């Protein structure tokens, strides 16, 4: 956003003024080494970057640097549909009834908006997270920072996915959707067989396996990692083949031109990417992978 909208000479002069410097030998390095707070100051001094440009950039990359989600079953006892506006009204009403500790680590879960893509509702939310620190006087204090998160509701396919939500708030949302849809909301456990069916073992680069009751001469947990792991399976000691996979990473093709590292937390049903994507890329990839997982069952 900075490079595309501000002339290089202006970037240099404004940033040097903020930093109290007179010159730089490498403008690109200078910009890339700055903190978020400094870059915000630069944007605030740059009328070229309008509110609409900021809003557009936010919408494009709204899912963050490492986008992902935790996937839940929504096992319904009856078929119940809720229109978009009714869904928005009910979740706002529910959130208004929640109570939090004044000094709690997470609090003030609030509704932001609801949009629909395909047959999925995306509910955007925000909450406050507490960060403790020592101030300039050496005193312990804290500050609350607003965090954004979202819920994808694919009730027609019996799933709900949540992003960037701490467990204590996630549990509150699970209760809400359980009551709203008369559904049992449970984590999808990603089993060894599901991994074999949905993801290519040729693309695996890191695997952690666990056995709570291992043979006497074997480890309880083992992690193997290599950029060419599929070519080096013979290096793994025998006896661990039937252990449960708890965490794994793959080289993942996101679309025809983009690849990244996909991480899978099997017990929690959590998938995440180590690559920043546009909103459309992430939604398209997520929908495909969710359908792959749901389709397995």
What are the residue ranges of the model-derived segments?
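Generic beta-strand structural signal
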Residues: 116, 153-155, 264-266
């Amino acid at each position: 956003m900075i490079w595309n909208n501000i002339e290089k000479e202006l970037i240099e002069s404004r940033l040097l003024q903020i930093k109290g410097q007179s010159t730089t030998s490498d403008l690109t390095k200078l910009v890339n080494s700055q903190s978020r707070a400094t870059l915000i100051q630069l944007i605030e001094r740059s009328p070229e970057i309008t509110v609409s440009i900021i809003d557009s950039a936010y919408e494009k990359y709204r899912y963050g640097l490492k986008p992902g989600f935790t996937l839940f079953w929504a096992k319904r006892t009856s078929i119940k549909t809720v229109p978009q506006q009714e869904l928005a009204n009910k979740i706002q009403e529910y959130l208004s009834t929640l109570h939090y500790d004044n000094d709690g680590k997470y609090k003030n879960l609030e509704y932001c908006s609801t949009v629909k893509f395909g047959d999925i509702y995306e509910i955007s939310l925000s909450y406050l997270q507490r960060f403790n620190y020592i101030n300039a006087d050496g005193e312990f204090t804290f500050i609350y920072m607003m965090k954004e998160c979202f819920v994808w509701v694919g009730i027609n396919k019996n799933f709900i996915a949540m992003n960037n939500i701490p467990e204590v708030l996630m549990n509150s949302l699970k209760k809400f959707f359980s009551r709203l849809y008369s559904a049992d909301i449970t984590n999808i456990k990603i089993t060894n067989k599901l991994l074999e069916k949905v993801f290519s073992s040729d693309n695996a680069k890191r695997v952690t396996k666990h056995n709570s009751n291992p043979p006497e001469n074997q480890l309880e947990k083992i992690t193997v990692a290599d950029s060419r792991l599929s070519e080096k399976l013979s290096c793994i000691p025998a006896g661990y083949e039937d252990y449960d996979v708890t965490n794994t990473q793959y080289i993942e093709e996101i679309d025809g031109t983009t690849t990244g590292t996909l991480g899978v937390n099997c017990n929690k049903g959590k998938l995440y990417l180590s690559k920043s994507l546009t909103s459309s890329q992430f939604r398209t990839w997520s929908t495909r992978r969710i359908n792959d997982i749901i389709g397995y069952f």
